[in-house]
Amino acid sequence: MLTLEIITPDAKVYSSQADGVEIPTESGEIGVRTTHIPLVTKLVAGELKVSKDGSVESIAVDYGFVKVLGDTLSVLTEAAINVSDIDLGEVESAQARAEEALKKAELEGTDPAEVERLSSSVRYLIAQKLAKGRSRRA
């Protein structure tokens, strides 16, 4: 079994044993099982899937980093939420507001760091919607 920890700047939001984990990375989705080679890679906004005892739990994650060492998988991310806790209406509303703020910032020549922050927010909200949509079909 793997020990999985998901940590945000605010708290450790998830800690559990898992048979395997599917992780969204810059180079595509990777699967981690026990005895995986040591790895550090960049995490992208998307759906992280935790397999345990024959079931799969989905967690929407923002960008960050992943470290695999031995049978421990550490995910350091700006934000994470269990798909079962996502309110789709709230996410769609937040996405519309974030996209509007992003358009305004780009038109006004806002500081590039602020534009990237807004763009990241939009990506994370899209990841939540996609993850929630997949979980309802499963």
Question: What label would you give each PLM region?
Answer:
Residues 1-3, 134:
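N-terminal export/targeting signal detector
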Residues 5-99:
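Compact, glycine-rich, soluble single-domain proteins
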Residues 84-138:
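Acidic/glycine-rich phosphate/pyrophosphate-binding loops and surrounding catalytic core
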